[in-house]
Amino acid sequence: MSTWSSMLADLKKRAEEAKRQVKKGYDVTKNGLQYGVSQAKLQALAAGKAVQKYGNKLVLVIPKEYDGSVGNGFFDLVKAAEELGIQVKYVNRNELEVAHKSLGTADQFLGLTERGLTLFAPQLDQFLQKHSKISNVVGSSTGDAVSKLAKSQTIISGIQSVLGTVLAGINLNEAIISGGSELELAEAGVSLASELVSNIAKGTTTIDAFTTQIQNFGKLAENAKGLGGVGRQLQNISGSALSKTGLGLDIISSLLSGVTRSFALRNKNASTSTKVAAGFELSNQVIGGITKAVSSYILAQRLRAGLSTTGPAAALIASSISLAISPLAFLRVADNFNRSKEIGEFAERFKKLGYDGDKLLSEFYHEAGTIDASITTISTALSAIAAGTAAASAGALVGAPITLLVTGITGLISGILEFSKQPMLDHVASKIGNKIDEWEKKYGKNYFENGYDARHKAFLEDSFSLLSSFNKQYETERAVLITQQRWDEYIGELAGITGKGDKLSSGKAYVDYFQEGKLLEKKPDDFSKVVFDPTKGEIDISNSQTSTLLKFVTPLLTPGTESRERTQTGKYEYITKLVVKGKDKWVVNGVKDKGAVYDYTNLIQHAHISSSVARGEEYREVRLVSHLGNGNDKVFLAAGSAEIHAGEGHDVVYYDKTDTGLLVIDGTKATEQGRYSVTRELSGATKILREVIKNQKYAVGKREETLEYRDYELTQSGNSNLKAHDELHSVEEIGSNQRDEFKGSKFRDIFHGADGDDLLNGNDGDDILYGDKGNDELRGDNGNDQLYGGEGDDKLLGGNGNNYLSGGDGNDELQVLGNGFNVLRGGKGDDKLYGSSGSDLLDGGEGNDYLEGGDGSDFYVYRSTSGNHTIYDQGKASDSDKLYLSDLSFDNILVKRVNDNLEFRSNNNSNSGVLTIKDWFKGGNSYNHKIEQIVDKNGRKLTAGNLGNNFHDTQQASSLLKNVTQEQNESNLSSLKTELGKIITNAGNFGVAKQGNTGINTAALNNEVNKIISSANTFATSQLGGSGMGTLPSTNVNSMMLGNLARAA
C-alpha cells in the first residue's frame, strides 16, 4: 500500500509540477509574445521615423573590402551614381551587419538605415548578375548605356515608360512577382525601380501599349458625366504616329495629347457640391483602372497567403487606393493640353502669314502637358501601390517594416520625378529657343518683330472694309493710316518661356497707304522723305500731291526707344526690366499745297510710368507740334497739349472727338487773326488715353518669368491739376463738344460749342457762333455776327451791328442791340425775340412765342403753324412796322378786341393758334403799339386806320378791307420783298472779301425773296450750314443764308 500510495503521491506531485511548468511556459510564451509585439511596434515606429527623416535619400553602401569590378553592370552603376543622385558610402563589416539587422534585410539589397534608403552593394551585385536583362542594359555591353544612364532625363523617360506600360494593362501581379523574393512587396518596389533601366529599349512597345490604355481611358471617360467629349477625343488617338518618336523627352511629349479642359471640376460656375461629386466620379469612373489593377494584385497576394478575400477586406483595400488618387492633379494637365490646342488652332492662320511662333508656343504646352501628364499618372500609380500595401499590412499580409520600405521607394521615385520635372521643362523651352535662334540667323531679323508683322497683316485683312472707307468718310483722295500693334500675349509668352524677353518690344507701329479704296503695296512715289519714325517722334507727309488724311487708327504709344534686361531675383524667379527713353514731342509736317485732314484722336500724349526701374512714379506729357500747309485743313486733336500752325487756307480745329473737362478758348490777346490759346481741364471724371507700364507673368514649372511692357488704358487721369495747353495759329474755326468757354478776338471768330452747355463770346469782329447741342449762351458783341443756338434752351445776344440770330430747337431767347439790321428766328419751341432800335425781321417759328421789335421799322412773320404768338411793338409813331401772314388769308381770319389787345384767329379751325398784338388800343403814352401794315398771303393789306381806335366787335378781317385792285395787292407784295431784301442783305455783312466777292448776289437775293413772299410756305428753322460743324462758306456766305431761307419755301 505504501508503495502504491507513494506512487500516487509521486504522480500527483509530478502532475502538479507539470501543471506548474505548463503554466510557467504559458506565462513565458505570453510574455514573449507581448514583448515581441511591443518590440515590433517600437521597430515599426523607429522605421517610420527613419523613413520620414531619411526617405528622400538613396545611399549605396559598399563594404570596404568588397570588390565589385567583376560584376556585370555594378561597377558602371557606381561610376554613374553621383550623377544619378545616389550617395556612395564605404563601410566596414561591423557597420554593415548592424545595418542588415536593423530591419532584417540581410538577404535583400534594399533596406532602411539611419542614413536613408540603402542599396547594399553585395546583394545588389548579386541581383544584377541574377537578372541578366537588367545588368546587360546597365553594363558596358550595351555600349553607350552608361552615358545614357548618367543623363537624368533618360532615366526619367525610362521610369515613365515602364510605369506607363504597367498602367497600359500589363499584369501588375506578374510584374511584381517576377522578382521571386520571399519579401514580395519589398522586392516588388525594388524590381520596379530596377526594371526602369531596361525599359529604355522598349520605347516603341511602351508607346503602343500606352496608346491602347489612352483609348480605354477614353471609353471610361465617355460614360462619365460631363466627360463625353473628352472620351470620344481620346479614342481617336493613333499609336502609329507616336511610335516614331524615339527615346527620352520625345517619348514623354507624345502622351495623353487628347486631354482637354472639359473636366467638370474646371467649371468656375459649378457649386462646391457639384465639384465634389465630379471628383468622386472622376476617381471611380476615369481612374478606376488604376484602383482595379492595384487591388487585383493585393487580393492575389492575400489569396496566396491564405488570408481573407471577402468583400469587407476588398473594400478596405480599394477604398485606400482610391483615396490615394487625386483627381485634381489631372486638372493642371488638362489645362496644358487645352491651351496647346487653342494656341495650335490660332497658329494656323499666322503660319500662313510667315510667323510660326504660335505653333512653337503650342508645342511647348503640348510637351509640358505630356511631361505633367506622365509624372502625374506615375505618381498616382505609385500612391495607389503604397496605399494598397498599407491596406494589406493592416490585414497582416506583411509587416510594418515592409510597408514602410515600399512607401519609401514610391516616395523616392515620386521625388525624383518631381525634381526632374523642372529640368525637363527647361529642356523643352531651350529646344524651342534654339529654333528661334536658328530662324533669326537664317533671316537676319528679330523673330518676335516678325510676329508683330504677321499680326498686322491679319489686321489689314480683317479691317480692310473699314480702312478703305476712310478716304470717302473724310473726303480725301489718299489716306495715310498709322496703326499700333500693341503688346501681344502669345508673343510675350513665347519670349518669356524661352528666356528671350530682352529681345522683345512692347509692340510695333505701322504706316499704310490707301488710295481710291485700295491698299497701296508700297509708299507713294511723291513721298520722297521718311514718313514715320516713332523712335524720333517725326511724321512727314509734306510731299503729298493729293488731298490727304493722316489718321491714327489705333492708339499710338509715345515716341522713343525701349531697352530690356533680364535679371534673376530668386532661385527660380526672373524679371525682364523695361527702360524707356522717351521723346517730349511729336512733330508733324503736313501737306504743303493741298487740303488735308489730321485726326490725332488716338495719339497718346500722357505717360504714367511706374516700373521696377523707375524711381517711384514718373509722369510725362508728349506735346504735339503740327505744321499744316496752305490748303483748307481740318484737325482733330487728342487729349494732350498741342501747337498747331495752320498756315494759309480755311483751317478748322476740332475738340469734339476726345473727352475733356472745361475748355477755354481765348483769343483776347491775339495780335493776328486765327491766334488762340486753349486750356483744357483733364482732371476729375475726364478719361484720357494714358501710357502705362504693365507686366505679364509666365510659369515654366517652378521658374517664373516677369516681363515689363508698355501698354495704354482709357482712364481717369487721377491728377486733380492736370491740364492741356494749346497754341493755335492761323485757325479760322474751332469746335468742341464739352462744357466750353469761347473768348473771341478782335478779329473774325468761328466757334462751335457742339455738346455741352457752352458760353461763346465773339467780342469784336464779324463772328459766327454755333451753340449746337446743350443750353448755350452766345454773345456776338460788336460786329456783324451770326449766332446759331442749335438744340437746347439757348440765349443769343447779337450786340451792336447787323446780326443774324437763329435759336433752333428749344425754348430760346434772342436779343439784339443797337440800331442795325437784324434777323431773329426762333425756330421750334417757346421763344422770346427782342429786336433792336433798327429794322428787324422777327420770325418766331413754331411754338408759343413772344416777339418784341422795339424801335425801328420791323418785319414780323406769322403762319398757321406758329402757335400762340404775342407781338409787343413798342415803337415810335414814325415807325412803319409790317406783319406778314405767310400762309393765311383774311377770308379765314376773325379780328377781335380783347381789352387793349387785338387778336387774330382762324374762323374755321379751333385748333389753330391765336396771334395777339399786345396793347394795340392802349393810349396815354408816347409809344406806338400798333402794326402799321398787316398783309395776308395774297398781298391784301390792313392798316391801323382800317381798324380804328374804337373797334370793339369781332369781325371778319376781309370785311375791314377797302376796295383795292389786284395790281395794288401785287404792289403790296413787291414792297414786302424790298423790305425783306433790305434787312437780309444788311444783316451780318455776309460777303467773303478774301474770295473777291464783297457784294450781294442780286439774282440769288431776288430769287430767294420771291420764293418766301410769293409762296404760302414757311421760313425754315434750320440754321446756317446745318446743325453740324463741318459745312463752311465756299463762295458767298450771303448766298448760303439765302439758301437757308429758300428751304423755308
Curated annotation (Swiss-Prot):
Task of the protein: Does not have hemolytic activity but shows a strong cytotoxicity towards alveolar macrophages and neutrophils.
The protein, known as: RTX-III toxin determinant A from serotype 2
UniProt keyword Methyltransferase, yes or no: no
Hemolysin-type calcium-binding repeats: 743-760, 761-778, 779-796, 797-814, 825-842, 843-860
Transmembrane segments: 154-170, 315-331, 397-413
Keyword Translocase: no
Name of the gene this protein is made from: apxIIIA
Topological category with respect to the lipid bilayer: Multi-pass membrane protein
GO-annotated molecular function: calcium ion binding; channel activity; toxin activity
Domains (record comment): The Gly-rich region is probably involved in binding calcium, which is required for target cell-binding or cytolytic activity. The three transmembrane domains are believed to be involved in pore formation by the cytotoxin.
Lineage: Bacteria, Pseudomonadati, Pseudomonadota, Gammaproteobacteria, Pasteurellales
Principal localisation: secreted
Entry's Gene Ontology BP terms: killing of cells of another organism
InterPro entries noted in UniProt: Hemolysin-typ_Ca-bd_CS, Hemolysn_Ca-bd, RTX_C, RTX_pore_form, RTX_toxin/Mannuronan_C5-epim, RTX_toxin_determinant-A, Serralysin-like_metalloprot_C
Pfam families linked to this entry: HemolysinCabind (PF00353), RTX (PF02382), RTX_C (PF08339)
Post-translational note: Palmitoylated by ApxIIIC. The toxin only becomes active when modified.
Originating species: Actinobacillus pleuropneumoniae
Compartments where located: Secreted; Host cell membrane
Family annotation (Gene3D superfamilies): Serralysin-like metalloprotease, C-terminal
Record's keyword terms, sorted: Calcium, Cytolysis, Host cell membrane, Host membrane, Lipoprotein, Membrane, Palmitate, Repeat, Secreted, Toxin, Transmembrane, Transmembrane helix, Virulence
One GO cellular component, as annotated: membrane
Protein family per UniProt: Belongs to the RTX prokaryotic toxin (TC 1.C.11) family.
